[in-house]
């Protein structure tokens, strides 16, 4: 069950959208510099938590402060890059019992809308596809900061989190305690303006 939640969180992570730029601009999510993360948190039998991440993903976003409806984000996650710091558990999560990474090797997020809530905050909506199922999700996001880096690039960084119900993606958690039926997806991204 943890495995399934990991994938969902990875996809959801891609959903962060920049909240304030002077004009419309395209950004590439900086995964090479380890400035972007797709992480998840799921209950372990209602007694503690399992934390993990998806280590391979790519994406981009466009942001227009004057026309937020034109803002967009696209992310693709390699499901088999799941890492919960326990190799045997990871293999089980990636198996047919949960994420079935051999049949569904990628998870994707494509935004469909954004609603600004002021003070560098807003709610991103979009379609998350995981385990062959596509569902609409909402993720509150926050602009952490933006500006020029020491190498002459312009960057913007965001974070967001949301809860995902695994059964919505065809992942059967009925044999596990109810606390394990949902996972928290957390993402933080730095984008480099192109």
What do the predicted segments below correspond to?
Residues 1-23:
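Gram-negative bacterial Sec-dependent N-terminal signal peptides
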Residues 22-194:
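Low-complexity, acidic/polar, glycine-enriched regions of mature
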């Amino acid at each position: 069950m943890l495995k399934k939640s990991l994938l969902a969180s990875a996809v959801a992570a891609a959903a962060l959208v920049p909240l304030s730029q002077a004009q419309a601009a395209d950004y590439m999510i900086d995964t090479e510099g380890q400035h972007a993360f797709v992480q998840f948190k799921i209950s372990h039998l209602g007694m503690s938590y399992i934390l993990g991440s998806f280590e391979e993903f790519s994406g981009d976003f466009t942001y227009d402060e004057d026309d937020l409806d034109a803002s967009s984000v696209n992310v693709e996650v390699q499901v088999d890059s799941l890492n919960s710091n326990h190799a045997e558990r990871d293999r089980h999560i990636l198996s047919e019992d949960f994420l079935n990474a051999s049949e569904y090797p990628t998870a994707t997020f494509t935004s469909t809308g954004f609603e600004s809530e002021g003070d560098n905050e807003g709610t991103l909506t979009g379609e998350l596809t995981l385990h062959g199922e596509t569902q609409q999700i909402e993720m509150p996001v926050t602009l952490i900061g933006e500006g020029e880096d020491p190498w002459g690039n312009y960057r913007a960084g965001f974070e967001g989190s949301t809860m995902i119900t695994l059964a919505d993606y065809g992942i059967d958690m009925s044999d596990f305690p109810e606390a394990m039926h949902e996972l928290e997806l957390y993402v933080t991204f730095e984008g480099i303006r192109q």
